[in-house]
Amino acid sequence: MLADIWYPNWWQALVLGMVQGITEFLPISSTAHLRVFPALLGWPDAGASFAAVIQLGSLGAVLIYFASDLRQLLLGSWKAWQKRDFQEESWRLLMGILVGTLPIVIAGWAVKAIWGSPPRQLWVVAAAAIGLALALGWAERVGKRRRDLHSLGIGDGLWVGLAQALALIPGVSRSGVTLTAALLLDLQRSAAARYSFLLGIPALFLAGVAEFIAEFRAEALLSQGLGTLSAFVFSYGSIDWLIRFLQRSSTWVFIVYRIGFGLFIFLGLALGFLQP
């Protein structure tokens, strides 16, 4: 029920926006951290709706950071459409992004219709964090990292999009699972990250707008607005850092972190300082 939803105060909203911004594009799951961080501080769970709305700040950061890339992508696709050149790089990339968005839209609608929201129990978060860490580690080992962004097509987009649908499970991480899928397609790490960011644009927009409309409450506007603003600022810095990091390093630091994070949650549940 809407009446049971907790809305953060102004400084709590800024803190949660910071957590969202830092973790959204790192392969460590923003949803998981937005579930665990408040629990450690003794705050109630703000819920999936609040998390989805403040993701619009992360979306704004992506749009600004990749403004030049998006402009070239859209102009190139428009020219390809005019020429009916459907093998052109920009057209294939755009179609891959659009097709890759369909699985998470369909899965998200199904989850909403059947269960109302994805499971948010901490044991689910912990298991998903460790499970995706193992998958990402496997992708690091077997991925050949020989393809760039311009080699991607519609089939690649569908494959990564199917993986993205798993991000509805808290703890999986949208960026983590799409990065894993892209590495398994032999993409270079920085190219895989860029594709993950671009593929996330429609998903973040649709989820944020849908939840804002469905769960609209006037008393939530201040906390949502401050959380979104904070998420925007920290997301921009996170994007820039991750792109630079993956140009020179692997994802193993995130793999180790995810395993440690998952084990910490299980330990907290076992000792009682975290509640399911």
Curated annotation (Swiss-Prot):
The keyword Cell inner membrane applies. Its main location: membrane. It catalyses: di-trans,octa-cis-undecaprenyl diphosphate + H2O = di-trans,octa-cis-undecaprenyl phosphate + phosphate + H(+). It is an enzyme of class 3 (hydrolase). GO terms for molecular function: undecaprenyl-diphosphatase activity. It is a multi-pass membrane protein. Catalyzes the dephosphorylation of undecaprenyl diphosphate (UPP). Confers resistance to bacitracin. One of its GO terms (biological process) is regulation of cell shape. It is found in: Cell inner membrane. This is Undecaprenyl-diphosphatase. It holds the Pfam family BacA. Keywords: Antibiotic resistance, Cell inner membrane, Cell membrane, Cell shape, Cell wall biogenesis/degradation, Hydrolase, Membrane, Peptidoglycan synthesis, Transmembrane, Transmembrane helix. The chain crosses the membrane at residues 46-66, 94-114, 122-142, 152-172, 196-216, 226-246, 253-273. Its EC number is 3.6.1.27. Bacitracin is thought to be involved in the inhibition of peptidoglycan synthesis by sequestering undecaprenyl diphosphate, thereby reducing the pool of lipid carrier available. Belongs to the UppP family. InterPro entries: UppP. The keyword Transit peptide does not apply. One of its GO terms (cellular component) is plasma membrane.
